[in-house]
Amino acid sequence: MDGGSTIAHGIFYKQVKILHLDLNARAALNTNSTDMSGLSVSTLVRVYQLKDRKSLDAADYESLLNEGDGVLASDLVDSQQLVVKPDEGAQLNVPLSLDAQYVAVVALFRAPDTENGTWRLVLAREDLEPDQARVIELGDNALNLVPLPKKDSWW
């Protein structure tokens, strides 16, 4: 890239250098339908920065639960873990690697919906914002990405 195209690239293309995630938990966060008390417990959430998503797409819940970093090793750039308590939240603000093209969020629920895969969520790098956190709701043993607010047009 020459100097002019570098400046244009910086102006017209968003450059995400920090991964901003807000994890918001509902009161019914991590429950088990066979537990009659309906006790909601804290949830371990793993956040993976990946070069590619092939190893993640091929992985099942059990393998990520037991050996996530090893299963994802061929694509893994970085990983973090957070504990999210029911009816509370957690924030993650960490450098986003230049090599990371995807961010995978994996919640280790007691009773995950492995059929629909709602225990994991994948964001492409272009889904991230440089100055705004992506909000992910945790509840009823599922992850849900909250849509970004619509930006007003300047014209």
In which residue ranges do the predicted regions lie?
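Bacterial Sec signal peptide processing site at the extreme N-terminus
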Residues: M1-V16
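Soluble periplasmic/extracytoplasmic beta-strand elements of cell-envelope proteins
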Residues: H20-N24, L44-Y48, A104-V106
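Short amphipathic, basic-aromatic surface patches that mediate peripheral association
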Residues: L21-M36, D52
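Short coil-to-beta strand junction motifs in C2/discoidin
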Residues: D35-R46
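Short beta-strand and strand-turn-strand segments in soluble, beta-rich domains
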Residues: E62-D78
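Exposed aromatic-hydrophobic patches
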Residues: D87-L96
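A short, solvent-exposed beta-strand micro-motif common in secreted/extracellular proteins
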Residues: A100-A111
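Glycine-rich, aromatic-bearing surface loops/beta-hairpins
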Residues: R120-W155
